[in-house]
UniProtKB/Swiss-Prot annotation:
Protein name: Protein TIPIN homolog
Keyword tags: Cell cycle, Cell division, Cytoplasm, DNA damage, Mitosis, Nucleus
InterPro entries in the record: Csm3, TIPIN/Csm3/Swi3
Positions of the UniProt region annotated as Disordered: 1-50, 252-279
Pro residues bias: start-end ranges: 262-271
C-alpha cells in the first residue's frame, strides 16, 4: 500500500544513483576534493619547488667556562691540591680549630683558582657529582699510582710528532712559479755589482770624494779624472802622458789630488784612443803646414795661367 505522503516516490528519487554492486562504491581515497582549485594552483608539500627553512643556529661568541671532568683533570685540577699543602705546619694539640681553618683556607684557594665563578660549597657539590664519572675515576687511579707524569710525557711526544707531520705536509706544497721567479730575482740582485749610488753610500765613511764612472759613446770616450798627485793614471794603473791641444800646446792639468778611486764600471769599457807622443804631434803639425803651402802654390799657378 502506498504511503499517503508518497514516501515511496521520495525513496526512489534518492536511491536512483546508488549502485547495486558494493564494489562500485567509491573508496576512502577517491572522495571529492575540497577546494580543488586551490590545490591545483598551489604547491604540493612533496614537490621540488618547496623551500625548506633551516632553523637558525645559535652561535655562542663568548662561552662561559664550565666545571667539567676536563677541568678537574686539567693543569689546575685535583692533582694540584698537594702543591698547596707543601709548606703547611700544624700547631698540634690545643690548636685543632686553627689547623682546620688553615686546611679549609688552602682548599678554598685551590677551588677559587680552578673555578672562580662558584663558591667553595658549589665547587664541592659539583666535584661530588662529577666524581661518579668513569674518566675522573681513571684519572684519580693513575694519580695514585704515579702514572700522570708518564701520560703527560707521551702526550707531549704525540704533540711534537703531530707538529712535525704538519711541517712536513707544509713542505710538500705545490711548486709556485711566482715564488721561484721572485727568489731568482733576489739572488741575481745579490750577485750583481753595486750601483754607483750603493757604492757611494758604502764608502761615505772613508771621507773620500768619488769620481763619476766613465762611459763610452761610439768612438768618443769620456773619462773622468782619477786619483793622483802630479800624474794621471789609466784603469790599469799605468801613467798616462799629458794631453795636447790641436796647436801642440799642453792642456791645463786639473788638480785631482782630492779625487778618490774610480768606480768599478758596470759594463766592460770600450778601448780608449791611443795617445800621441810629442814627436808625432810635431810631425802632424809639420805635414799640415807643408800641405797648406802646396795648396797655396797650386792655387797661384792656376790663377796665373788663366790671366
Amino acid at each position: 500500500m502506498a504511503s499517503l505522503f508518497g514516501d515511496d516516490g521520495v525513496d526512489d528519487l534518492f536511491n536512483d544513483n546508488i549502485p547495486t554492486d558494493p564494489d562500485q562504491l567509491p573508496s576512502d581515497g577517491e572522495g571529492e576534493k575540497l577546494f580543488a582549485d586551490d590545490e591545483d594552483n598551489g604547491v604540493e608539500p612533496g614537490s621540488q619547488d618547496a623551500q625548506i627553512v633551516e632553523p637558525k643556529k645559535r652561535a655562542v661568541r663568548n662561552p662561559r667556562p664550565r666545571l667539567t671532568v676536563e677541568t678537574l683533570r686539567g693543569p689546575r685540577g685535583i692533582q694540584t691540591i698537594e702543591d698547596y699543602f707543601k709548606d703547611i705546619k700544624f700547631k698540634g694539640k690545643g690548636y685543632e680549630k686553627t689547623d682546620l681553618d688553615e686546611v679549609l683556607r688552602r682548599l678554598q684557594h685551590w677551588g677559587h683558582r680552578m673555578y672562580p665563578t662558584y663558591t667553595f660549597d658549589d665547587v664541592l657539590n659539583n666535584i661530588e657529582r662529577l666524581g661518579k664519572k668513569k674518566p675522573l675515576q681513571v684519572h684519580m687511579a693513575r694519580y695514585r699510582l704515579g702514572q700522570l707524569e708518564q701520560m703527560r710525557a707521551h702526550e707531549a711526544e704525540a704533540l711534537e710528532e703531530a707538529q712535525d707531520e704538519q711541517q712536513e705536509g707544509a713542505g710538500d706544497e705545490p711548486f709556485d712559479e711566482f715564488d721561484a721567479l721572485l727568489g731568482e730575482q733576489i739572488a741575481m740582485s745579490r750577485l750583481a755589482p753595486p750601483s754607483p749610488q750603493q757604492w757611494k753610500m758604502s764608502t761615505a765613511s772613508s771621507n773620500s770624494t768619488l769620481a763619476t764612472p766613465s762611459f763610452s759613446r761610439g768612438n768618443a770616450v769620456m773619462s773622468t779624472p782619477y786619483s793622483g798627485v802630479n800624474a794621471t793614471f789609466d784603469r790599469s794603473g799605468a801613467s798616462v802622458a799629458p794631453a795636447f791641444d790641436r796647436n801642440g800646446a799642453p792642456l791645463a792639468s786639473m788638480d785631482i789630488s782630492d779625487y778618490g778611486q774610480p768606480l768599478p764600471p758596470s759594463q766592460p769599457p770600450t778601448p780608449a784612443a791611443k795617445k800621441l807622443s810629442n814627436e808625432q804631434m810635431a810631425r802632424i803639425a809639420e805635414n799640415r803646414r807643408l800641405a797648406q803651402e802646396r795648396l797655396k802654390a797650386k792655387q797661384q799657378q792656376e790663377s796665373g795661367s788663366k790671366s
